[in-house]
Every structure is written in C-alpha cells, then in structure tokens.
Amino acid sequence: MTGLSAPAAIVARGWGIRQPGRRAWALRQVDLVIEPGERALLLGPSGAGKSTLLTAIAGLHDPAAVETEGTLLVDGLEPRLARDRSGLLFQDPESQIVMARAGDEVAFGLENRCVPADAIWGRVDAALAAVDFPYGRDRPTHALSGGEQQRLALAATLALAPGLLLLDEPTANLDPDAAAEIRSVVGQAVDRLGATLVVVEHRVGEWLPIVDRVVVIEAGGGVVADGPPRTLFAEHGAQLAATGVWIPDQPPAAAARGKLPPAETLVIAEDVTYRYPDEVRDALAATSVSLRSSEAVALVGPTGSGKSTLALLLAGLLRPSHGTVIAGEALAAGRGHEPLAGWSARELARHVGTVFQDPEHQFLTGSVRDELLLGPRRAGLAAPEAAVRANELLERLRLAHLAQANPFTLSGGEQRRLSVASALATAPRLLVLDEPTFGQDRRTWGELVHLLSALRDDGRSVCVATHDRAFEHALADRTLRLGGRS
C-alpha cells in the first residue's frame, strides 16, 4: 500500500479532560509517552476514559465543548492539527459509517486526504480484502450486521495507512474466529506500516502477542500501571483485577445455580425466517426454538448468521417473513398462542425486556434516571413503585453516580449497563439481550452474570445473543448455534 505515514509519537503531560455538564473529570493528570512504532494495549475499568483518551489523541474533541488541562501532543502538534497522521476505529462502528455503499465508505477518507484518484480504488479493494469483507464495493452499508460494520470500518481505517493506529474494541462485535482473523490483520498492518498502535480491548490475552506494552488508566485519574505485559500482570495483576481490569486467563467465577421453580414455555418460534426490505437473501435461515422460564439460552454463531435478527423476532419487535413466533400462556395469561409481533408496545414493555445491539438506539430521554422511569410509566406502574425500581437498578448496575447524566454521554460499557437496567425496569418475565457484555470490565461483567443468573433462578427466561464464549459458559443452560447467511 503506497502513501505510508511515518510512525507517530504521543506525549501527555498532566493532561486531563472534563465533559460538558459533568463535575468529575473523565481523566486527570495523565502522564504518558508512547514512542514511534510502539504497540500499546490500553486497559482500565468501565468508564475509566479509554475511549475518551483515544478520541482526544485522534483530535476529534471540540476544544470549545470540553474542558482540558495540561498538554497532549501527537508528533509535537495539538492532536487536531495532526489528524492526518492518525486513523481511529470507533467503539461503535456504525457511528463512523457515513456512506451508502461499502466501497464509497473506504474511499471517503482517502478522498478527504487528497489521495490521487487513480490510486484510490486499488487501496479500497486491498483494504476490503485484508479484513475479509464478505461483499463487494456496492454492498449497502445499512444492510450490514454489527460485525460486518466493524470489518468495514477497520478497512476504511487501514486504507489510510496512518502513522498512528487507534483501535477502540476492534473485535467486540465479532465471533471468536473472526476476531482472531482481525487481530492477525492488525498485526500484519502495523508490521507493514511501521505504525504506532494503541488498542483498547477486553480480550486481553489474545492481544499480547501483538503489543509490547500495557498502559492502565483509572476513572478521573491518570496512568496507574505501565510496562511490558508479562511484568505488569505479574506485579499488579491481583490489584488490577480487583478494580475491574481484565487479566489474562483469570475469568470471574460463574454464579452457582439455585433451586429452580418448574419451567414453563414463554415463547415458541417455529421455522422462522426473516428478510429485510430490498434484500435478496434471508438474514435468518429457517430456525425453531422455544424459550422457557428458569432457563438461559445463548444464541451464538458467526458474524452475519442472524443472531440479532432472531433476538428481535423473539422479542416481538420484528414480524417473521415465514414461520411463527407465538406467546405461551405463561408469558401473559389469556394471550397464549397469539403472535408476539401483534402485541402493543405497552404489552411488550410489561412482559418482554429487550437490549439492542446498539444501546443508544433505545435511549429516549435526557437523563439516566428518566430512562429507567420511562418503561415502568409506559407499563402503567405507579410513580412511587417506578422510582423504587429505578433506584435499585441504579445501585445494582453501578450507575447511581450517573443518574443525572445524559445517556448519550456515557461510555460504551455504561450505556450497555443502562440498557440492561432499562430492560429490567418493568420486571418482565422474558429478557432478550443482544451482546450485553460489550464494553464491560471484569467486575461489571461478573456482576452482570450474577444478576442474570439470579433472575433466571427466580423464574425468568433469559435469551442472549453473544460472541462472548466465557459469558455463554457462565450463564447459558442451552445454546442455539446459527449458521452463515442462507
């Protein structure tokens, strides 16, 4: 790939940042030097400011919209003046996809950087091939799954051949096999480019062969640990694990099963398929599954196999193209054998709690507390009871300190916990969750497993679409494996 940039250096001295409307600093007194060509894994608890730091290094913060202190430089320049030196993959890939077709998305950044027209499409094709993008240039971006969006966004980033590669959870939406492929692609890319690499990931062990340094930050503070991976984890592993940092080969303990009440069938899906409008192929091939109380079911499979689509069908939010999804009598008395997609929004809110793959798509209010009150109010709960539930969930999911914050200003992990809390606010009998562990640190991951296990043991049904094998093993009683696209 031509037009390579020299590896970039990062220097932070006493640097800090505070978001609008927040009393607490997201980061403060950050002292950090990353030399050209170094490969650093950036770790920290959920909400520690990892994404904020990457975005700042990329020069994407509006100086008029945030408060900063100290110095942050990329190759001796303010980050906003060095934007052409870096390439950033966002935590939410959909938020950076702006073009209608895949090829145009990859070409967009190259055009903005004035790459000669006769060189653009060769670089586009090479980048798409490098990430094993499963479609051609003309694939509509709106038709991509979350994992396919992640591949496309990475292709667009790599096509720039940046001197500084900033990756925020680059494999979070990918199945384990695809994640391994992408790690290999990134390793080969930084070898070829000689680029400086800073990556945020919770799959720590898998990235250790690629990085030569680990940097750990804390919420509201700065760097608390920094060094070669083996040395750092040997000296600080136990302490870091206690604060929520993921440590290689040390998963949190799974919850023990309690005594279960008798199982009842809540939802039955028979031979269901779904095809999105204007598509020529089914997003979900014919699938049958039943969801029962006191049971957790994991939906797993490769990227693009239809996990998110099946989750929406089971939650009553999509109507099948073929087949049926019907409610059991145990889900709502008097509504047994009715198509779930025919229920009103209020009925669904009372009986089915849903967490989307992109949690910000379900936020409708201006504060975390109001978001938790919305569902109970729609379901007809009295205000005092709704307030009690909201307060309990704020504490249980470590969101109490963010009660007045705007949901759209939360970190990815905090947004995911808020979406889980919102799904639980109406005390539904059925929970359908899409990638609920995205962005969670070791501590909040374990707490989420224990919370969902307790709900299952209390007689609820839990259905999760997930790429997280550890989460599947810790929670699921039954696993449904989906294949590739039909």
Predicted stretch roles:
Residues 18, 61, 71-82, 324-347:
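ABC ATPase NBD Q-loop/coupling interface
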Residues 58, 315:
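Helix-to-loop junction immediately C-terminal to a conserved catalytic motif
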Residues 158, 423-424:
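ABC ATPase C-loop
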